[in-house]
Regions:
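Solvent-exposed interaction patches of small proteins and small membrane subunits
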Residues: 1, 5-8, 31, 62-65, ...
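Short, contiguous alpha-helical
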Residues: 28-76, 105, 116-156
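Alpha-helical bundle segments that constitute or directly flank the non-heme di-iron/ferroxidase center
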Residues: 1-26, 51-55, 59, 136-140
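Solvent-exposed, charged/polar functional surfaces in cytosolic regulatory/catalytic domains
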Residues: 16-23, 100-107, 143, 147
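Short acidic/polar alpha-helix capping motifs at helix-coil junctions
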Residues: 4-7, 19-23, 68-70, 80-86, ...
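Alpha-helical structural elements of signaling/regulatory helical domains
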Residues: 2, 48, 52, 88-89, ...
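Hydrophobic residues in alpha-helical segments
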Residues: 21, 60-61, 108-111
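Acidic/histidine-rich alpha-helical segments that form the ligand environment
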Residues: 9, 13, 78-117, 137
């Protein structure tokens, strides 16, 4: 897939998740099933994950090859009461997701094919290229968008 096709897929995934998240009604936010997160938790997770992705892409672009790309424990973040996954309004998280994705897309649109092989060392995943970043963060909102649909249907 060319960088232009990858950028288009990244943007499409952004719009897919935003359309779903913006369509969740307030009385649907806390629909939860035993195996998964509620719609509220999914939306907050996507905002936090994208904040991580924003920093990761910039490190991969700007820092020397082999720089450390920090992981994080999403499950710990999800249960930290101060982060509000269980209760905070989702509007700010939707705005963060949209803004961060737009900023990252600007960078993706300036990449050249050769940039896709720039790499760092992810603390959990090991060797980590811009291509791997792009693939992962293109799929991530699609996967969680599908999870959001299932949560609203009461399935997982």
């Amino acid at each position: 897939m060319s960088i232009q096709e990858s950028a288009a897929a990244y943007e499409s995934a952004t719009q897919y998740f935003l359309n779903l998240a913006r369509g969740v009604m307030k009385d649907q936010l806390d629909i939860k099933n035993p195996e998964g997160w509620s719609a509220r938790q999914i939306i907050h997770h996507l905002a936090d994950s994208e904040a991580q992705s924003y920093a990761r892409l910039r490190r991969l672009v700007a820092e020397p090859e082999g720089s450390t790309i920090q992981g994080y424990d999403e499950n710990l973040w999800a249960v930290a009461p101060q982060l509000g996954y269980e209760s905070a309004p989702v509007e700010n998280s939707i705005a963060v997701f949209a803004a961060v994705r737009a900023g990252s897309l600007d960078i993706v649109n300036r990449l050249e094919e050769s940039d896709l092989e720039k790499s760092g060392v992810h603390t959990e995943a090991g060797h980590y290229t811009i291509a791997k970043w792009l693939e992962g963060y293109t799929n991530h909102p699609k996967d969680h968008g599908d999870q959001l649909v299932r949560a609203l249907k009461g399935l997982n």
